[in-house]
Amino acid sequence: MVVVLDTVSANPVRPRHPEKVNRPDALSPPKPDWIRVRAPNSRGYADTRRIVKENGLVTVCEEAGCPNIGECWDKKHATFMIMGDTCTRACAFCNVRTGMPAALEASEPEYVAEATHKLGLAHVVVTSVDRDDLDDGGAEHFAQTIRAIRERCPATTIEILTPDFLRKDGALEKVVAAKPDVFNHNLETVPSRYLTVRPGARYFHSIRLLQRVKEIDPTIFTKSGIMVGLGEERHEVLQVMDDLRSADVDFLTIGQYLQPTRKHHAVMRYVTPDEFQGYETVGYTKGFLMVSASPLTRSSHHAGEDFAKLQTARAKLLR
């Protein structure tokens, strides 16, 4: 865990990533043509941004610099990020602000539910920063948000993307008891890259977290994702697939890592669209109900459409 607090300046202006300020620049190769996206400028994008701001909400779409924000917000699809905009971890790949977070906003679950209603979402995705500073890692806040959405928008299906609740006994059980439709927790990368990419996390703890969800409530769909282009080998990606299937995970996403700033981990290489297609094919042969693998695949991209496909795939399996 990395927690940074400025106790010197009267009115401190903190850098977004203070722990990275003194690092040397990490240079990445130029982006290939298949990575480029259009700048967001549509009416739907503007409407979504207005609703998000009016409700005082944070989205991972903005905070993480997602390349799909224009496409998703044009369709009024947004991923709400609860518990503030500041994370207690300092992962080498992530653009979310790091440091000591503010206290939880007690009304936030209702604000998220109201924004879900205003956007007319049939499927909503809720994620969060890591909150190692809280006794339960924010689990009760997650559960309250799920319950608030259920009350305000009973027909809306709910997908959550959670932190790992490392060393937070009982936290996972609180979240699962609120019965989200999809429980997503991303592994982010292969085990050999954890010390440099995701040093505050533990690979097999994350695998066990996903496995426990299914043990507690087998009806909940489970989902996980990784980025490629961080120096991993193909055989390591295939091993991650096997580990996830051993935990009975239903849905795998694989996308290209893109460097947020030069202070973040460099892109080691750009994986080709054909390689992504190969990963998707192999993933299906290993038994996943859904696999989404492409350069611009992200955890919440097309989440609503993918949830419908998950339901169909499970129904076919149970016939």
Swiss-Prot record:
Tell me, in one coarse class, where this protein mainly resides. Answer: cytoplasm
Q: Where is the Radical SAM core domain?
A: 73-289
Indicate yes or no for the key word Amino-acid biosynthesis: no
Which Enzyme Commission numbers does its entry carry? 2.8.1.8
Q: Where does [4Fe-4S] cluster 2 bind?
A: C87, C91, C94
The free-text note explaining how the cofactor binds reads:
Binds 2 [4Fe-4S] clusters per subunit. One cluster is coordinated with 3 cysteines and an exchangeable S-adenosyl-L-methionine.
Give the pathway listed in the UniProt entry for this protein.
Protein modification; protein lipoylation via endogenous pathway; protein N(6)-(lipoyl)lysine from octanoyl-[acyl-carrier-protein]: step 2/2
| Gene Ontology CC: one annotated term | cytoplasm
Q: Does the keyword Ribosomal protein apply?
A: no
Region annotation (Disordered) maps to 8-29
The GO molecular function terms of this record are: 4 iron, 4 sulfur cluster binding; lipoate synthase activity; metal ion binding
Q: Which cofactor does it need?
A: [4Fe-4S] cluster
Q: Which SMART domains match?
A: Elp3
Which top-rank group of organisms is this from? Bacteria
Keyword annotations for this protein, in alphabetical order, are: 4Fe-4S, Cytoplasm, Iron, Iron-sulfur, Metal-binding, S-adenosyl-L-methionine, Transferase
Q: Which InterPro entries match?
A: Aldolase_TIM (IPR013785), Elp3/MiaA/NifB-like_rSAM (IPR006638), Lipoyl_synth (IPR003698), rSAM (IPR007197)
Intracellular or extracellular location(s): Cytoplasm
Q: Which reaction does it catalyse?
A: [[Fe-S] cluster scaffold protein carrying a second [4Fe-4S](2+) cluster] + N(6)-octanoyl-L-lysyl-[protein] + 2 oxidized [2Fe-2S]-[ferredoxin] + 2 S-adenosyl-L-methionine + 4 H(+) = [[Fe-S] cluster scaffold protein] + N(6)-[(R)-dihydrolipoyl]-L-lysyl-[protein] + 4 Fe(3+) + 2 hydrogen sulfide + 2 5'-deoxyadenosine + 2 L-methionine + 2 reduced [2Fe-2S]-[ferredoxin]
**Pfam families noted in UniProt:** Radical_SAM
Gene3D superfamilies per UniProt: Aldolase class I
Annotated residues for binding of [4Fe-4S] cluster 1: C61, C66, C72, S300
Q: Which family does it belong to?
A: Belongs to the radical SAM superfamily. Lipoyl synthase family.
Stored PANTHER family: LIPOYL SYNTHASE, LIPOYL SYNTHASE, MITOCHONDRIAL
Quote the protein name from its UniProt record: Lipoyl synthase
Source organism (scientific name):
Nitrobacter hamburgensis (strain DSM 10229 / NCIMB 13809 / X14)
